[in-house]
Amino acid sequence: MNTRLALVLCAVGSGVLSFSCARTAEPTPAASTHVPVTTAGALSVTPPSSTDRWYQFSRTDGRVHLRACPAPSQPSAPEHFVPWTEAVRLSAVDAQQELLLINRAGVLPATQLARMQTAPVPRKAPSTPAAETTSLTLTPPALLATQSAEGFYSEPIPNSSPHPCQGTGAVFVRLYTDPLFTTSPQDSAAPFLVRYDVRTARWTSVAYTRALGLPRNAQCTALTHTRGTWYASFKSSEAERVSFAYFSFPSLSSLENLGPTQRREHPIGGKVQVPRPISAAAFRAACTPQRLHLPTASTSSDHHSDLHELLVHRLLARVPLSPLYLSARSPCWASDRSFLKTAHRTADERAHHANALIFHPPRARLSAALLTDSGHLYFVREDGSEGHARLSALPPQFVYTSFTLSGPSLIAGWEEQDFFQVGSTGLLCTEVESLTGT
């Protein structure tokens, strides 16, 4: 999930990205234990990291490898850091269809990690290529090899559908190139939105910036769906001038109808549906993260969506961190939703980030879960009870990112961060039951 939307909102109206909103990690204690907490507040400590399996990404000869490794413990050498847009890292998850979006690599089905779970944990970093049972290799599709992949999206399923929260077998992915960071030639003909077919693993182009009448080097920096409408922002660089453009549109298919070049308007259902330019203020009003509050289930006709938003606010209320930027996803939502928890703060307090997932139907007996960048897991069980656990602590400058559940496992991304650069990255797989006691 993309918590970097906060960076985009910092740029709205100014034309310059401010990294003052960049993600920073909460200091973490040295302890490395899983500590489930019941609603009554009683603690029960489980064996330290007994079910953890750590994996690290690497890239050689155009391929991406995921290999079993020991838990992160040492900082990377400075030359190993790259801008976050260029790093091989967990970028987003589709919890409903159990998909992991790996930047610069493609889509990794979470179920593929299952065959690696029984392999012995290495005592030290391997000096030779890992055995087949402890590694996976991904060959990036051409569309993703030179662009950053940011976020899973889907067309909203009508609430009248018998299964309004089920996956459709296809997902959309936003592509982005930052000319300040990339070492690859910028392809002005590349799409900014592509479709991935889960059944066939095929990628197809969907939408192009040229079709919107934007400069050839325009890049889609944000895409979100809220209150029945899609919103997108685009950044263009010309000489030393940076400009932004904003659009709203009713559906992703309205982008697809435009094709790679500008076409005539296409009527859909008797109405013309095309992207329309909007102001920076309109984009900001629609996409600024929601502040913590408790909405009622009658605020819209989408009953499932409202109940799921209530679960998000319930989890947010339990997190003793502020300010906290949260990126949340429900299978009933077409894109991630952003939330902001604020309180009185001092000048030296830092922003924290978290990701939350709603499971519909429940997964591993959980209805919802929230993971902070420091590894605190807050969850709501299917019986309505709440709990809190702690993933293994990471060294300084390492943080947890997106996560999902697959079978008996919780899979969380981890990465080493230094300002806008990223060092080591990988995945942690651990048993859900050891965390939640379910």
Curated annotation (Swiss-Prot):
Chain residues carrying a lipid of type S-diacylglycerol cysteine: C21
The main place the protein resides is membrane
Signal peptide: which range, if any?
A: 1-20
Q: Residues bearing covalent lipid (N-palmitoyl cysteine)?
A: C21
Topology in the membrane?
Lipid-anchor
Query: Does the keyword field hold Membrane?
Result: yes
Q: Which UniProt keywords apply?
A: Cell membrane, Lipoprotein, Membrane, Palmitate, Signal
Intracellular or extracellular location(s):
Cell membrane
**Can the keyword Cell membrane be found in this entry's annotation?**
yes
Gene Ontology annotations for the cellular component aspect, listed alphabetically: plasma membrane
PROSITE patterns the UniProt entry points to: PROKAR_LIPOPROTEIN
Protein name as it appears in the record: Uncharacterized lipoprotein TP_0456
Organism expressing this protein natively: Treponema pallidum (strain Nichols)
